[in-house]
Curated annotation (Swiss-Prot):
Chief location of this protein within or outside the cell: plastid
Functional summary from the UniProt entry: F(1)F(0) ATP synthase produces ATP from ADP in the presence of a proton or sodium gradient. F-type ATPases consist of two structural domains, F(1) containing the extramembraneous catalytic core and F(0) containing the membrane proton channel, linked together by a central stalk and a peripheral stalk. During catalysis, ATP synthesis in the catalytic domain of F(1) is coupled via a rotary mechanism of the central stalk subunits to proton translocation.
Alphabetical list of InterPro entries matching this protein: ATP_synth_OSCP/delta_N_sf, ATPase_OSCP/dsu
Underlying gene: atpD
Quaternary data: F-type ATPases have 2 components, F(1) - the catalytic core - and F(0) - the membrane proton channel. F(1) has five subunits: alpha(3), beta(3), gamma(1), delta(1), epsilon(1). CF(0) has four main subunits: a(1), b(1), b'(1) and c(10-14). The alpha and beta chains form an alternating ring which encloses part of the gamma chain. F(1) is attached to F(0) by a central stalk formed by the gamma and epsilon chains, while a peripheral stalk is formed by the delta, b and b' chains.
GO cellular component: chloroplast thylakoid membrane; proton-transporting ATP synthase complex
UniProt cross-references to NCBIfam families, sorted A to Z: ATP_synt_delta
Family of the protein in this entry: Belongs to the ATPase delta chain family.
UniProt-recorded name of the protein: ATP synthase subunit delta, chloroplastic
A molecular function (GO) term: proton-transporting ATP synthase activity, rotational mechanism
Ion transport as UniProt keyword: yes
UniProt entry keywords in alphabetical sequence: ATP synthesis, CF(1), Chloroplast, Hydrogen ion transport, Ion transport, Membrane, Plastid, Thylakoid, Transport
Membrane topology field: Peripheral membrane protein
Cell compartment(s), UniProt: Plastid, Chloroplast thylakoid membrane
Amino acid sequence: MILLLTNSKIIYPYSEALFSIAKDQEKFEVIKNDMELFVTFTKNLNGFKKFLETPLINKNKKIKVVKDVFSKILNSTTLNFISILINKNRIMFVSNISEKYNQLVLKDKSVKLVKIACARQLSEKQAQALSEVLKHKFKCLSVKLIFNIEPELIAGFKIFIESQVIDVSLQGELKEFEWYLTK
């Protein structure tokens, strides 16, 4: 729990700063795409991630490598931000910072990020209907639905929005029924 609180105290200020810069420069999407590309690259190349996170390697050397590799791909604002993360020994949080930045952008656009775990893929019509219900319930202009197929739910789905979980799955109903039986 303490580690989680410490991480959020680190992640939020950096993601807020990046959001503020992106807003001033009107580069929400460019920076979002850059951060996602960088995060994907570091996740897929484990050696590169270890290189960046190793405190024994000189920070200037890390920054030089990042700039050499990404200078033609990433926006200069994004590169400078990543350099700051390296300088402040915060590069290990880049994935979390990127995720929080994306949430701030969506919030600014009055878009709610909704993760949906379902037993099978919903049809386009079902997804649209669910989207309309969620927009009305959470009073927002738009919702961004991210689906994750989880066959163990049997039927129905779970909705994760902000800190809320709405479980309308058969698995959830069975667990609740089991709880009543064992009570």
